[in-house]
Amino acid sequence: TIDMELQKKVEESIEKNLRAFKSSEPLLDRAFVVMTNPNNGQILSMAGKKIVEKEGKIEVEDLALGNMTTSYELGSAVKGATLLTGYETGAIHPGDQFYDAPMKFKGTQAKKSWNVSGFGNINDLRALQVSSNVYMFQTALKIAGVNYVPNGSLDIKQGAFDTMRYYFKQFGLGVPTGIDLPNEIIGQTRKVDSQPGFLLDFSIGQYDTYTPLQLAQYISTIANGGYRMQPQIVQEIREQSIKEEVGKVIRSIEPVVLNRIDMKKEHIDRIKEGFRWVFQEGDGTGVKYFKNAPYKPAGKTGTAQTVYGGDDPIGRNAKGERMECYNLTLVGYAPYDNPEVAFSVVVPWLHDDKNGINSIIGKEVLDVYFDLKQQRIHGEATSTGSSKQN
């Protein structure tokens, strides 16, 4: 199903941006993109690149399989799953408001949104638009049946983790995606849930780890209205042919629905409207890059505070401790009213959480997808690979 022209352009975007940002980002060594047709699960592009320094020279190697064999904290990109879990458990309802200001708990540092003074009174759509952490923390507390008391202690039972993971897994977060390739991992489900504050971290994508492919399956599931599709690389199997012509089809691989998420359509549509706000409205965190795109994208930016997970000694301090850094992620689909392509971008281990490399790559690969589509309509580009864009 891989669209070879698209794949080549996506790889070029990743390599170009890795090289451009490397001088200011010493820990940066990899980036990943998955693009799918959300309606049938076909993978249109699965690309990953890794910087390797050899004899003082920077070389870029292929790491496409890293999309399914490496996992990371993916940050705010997963907030759609948090809100949907809140709706479905009855913990929150569409339109509910919370006051976004730093939250203080006994014996811990304040938990807050990236805008440290807070966003004031906000609803769920606004929470997605500006990526409020506090709204997600409040949602997680409601799921756990706990009311926030300033400077109070937190009493969160293991069952709250189980509930949130149960719903996250319906999107493919924390379970096998079902891709028709070997050696897929499911990420890390952390076991040290005894500290209740970790549920708050989980709600903003800073606890369990997921693969870039799982992230693509999650956003595809929202894009298509709630169906988790098996990701497919193979579209058909043909007979071996002695001559140059293509052998006849022995078996066509049909799309496979792995599950329908246990969530109401109006709730999924509510999240999709929030994702539209992120890219299209006001001070949405993706507006700078996506507002004027003619193909009308929607999506969600992501930032996760983490520690360096690579092997380079440069990623450790004098005591040998792993250095703190950020993972930048992005999910989206287009057009927002009738999605035909969905994507995930994952760029781990950055010092600057505002350099925009995730959005730059995301915009470039969406531009390429729709440029190729137009060229094919006008007969200017060949459709290589078996996946035609329609």
Predicted regions located by residue number:
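Beta-lactam-recognizing serine transpeptidase/beta-lactamase-like catalytic domain environment
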Residues: 2-6, 25-74, 81-347, 388-390
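Structural motif corresponding to the C-terminal cap of alpha-helices
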Residues: 13-22, 51, 147, 373
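Charged, solvent-exposed alpha-helical segments that act as regulatory interaction surfaces
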Residues: 23, 228, 284, 371, ...
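Short beta-strands and strand-coil junctions in structured, solvent-facing domains, enriched
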Residues: 351-353
